[in-house]
């Protein structure tokens, strides 16, 4: 076990996801998707505060103007810092009856991307939606069962995107305006106890840190998809990572306890908690939504 690994939030989420470090505030935000909650951790004193939203909260980004852009089950909305829901910018592209938003983030050009997962998970019905600063929405990709692992390389040359139940990691080349090209298969993960690719983030060296759901670890992958390092965790169900701290060398990791039996939770009691560990390579500051 990594000697610097700590549990920094012991109050568990049902499905903790989408950790986002605010450089401006020096705090960590994350979502409890199924509870519709947006949490905020101040690591200086360990305090946690929460905004309760009216629907499941798949993912979110921070805004230049303050507040958030949030992907709820029914669509993408603006949200102020006090939790007041504002304008709806886009509907769920795959329909709220059979899907919800899952993973997403703001790209280096200040646009918000959010992917959906198909319910039930019997087809590749998930899509990836982008909302720009003028609040125009466009479907950018599809043909996935669970849209996940979206991250943009620090040189702005690539977008990585995983499909968790299908055990695959893709990448898209990006042009100078951030428009994606043809999808490429970067890595197919072995089926078994090693886990499935969930949420992720890039470090400043261009390596991709991927939470391995049901595998109890985080992998650091080279730009061509080779495993360089791994961090073992006290839960089998990590969901996503984010770089934070003043030097962006603290790796925060969210996790899940959704649908776990009493026996599983007895074996893994910290499931749903937030963890942090120090790493050698800093991450990248999370961009802000320009709209």
Curated annotation (Swiss-Prot):
It catalyses: 6-deoxy-6-sulfo-D-glucono-1,5-lactone + H2O = 6-deoxy-6-sulfo-D-gluconate + H(+). Belongs to the SMP-30/CGR1 family. Its cofactor is a divalent metal cation. Pfam families: SGL (PF08450). GO terms for biological process: L-ascorbic acid biosynthetic process. SUPFAM superfamilies: Calcium-dependent phosphotriesterase. Keywords: Hydrolase, Metal-binding. It comes from the Bacteria. Its EC number is 3.1.1.99. Binds 1 divalent metal cation per subunit. The keyword Endoplasmic reticulum does not apply. This is 6-deoxy-6-sulfogluconolactonase. The active site is at residue 198. A divalent metal cation binds at residues 17, 148, 198.
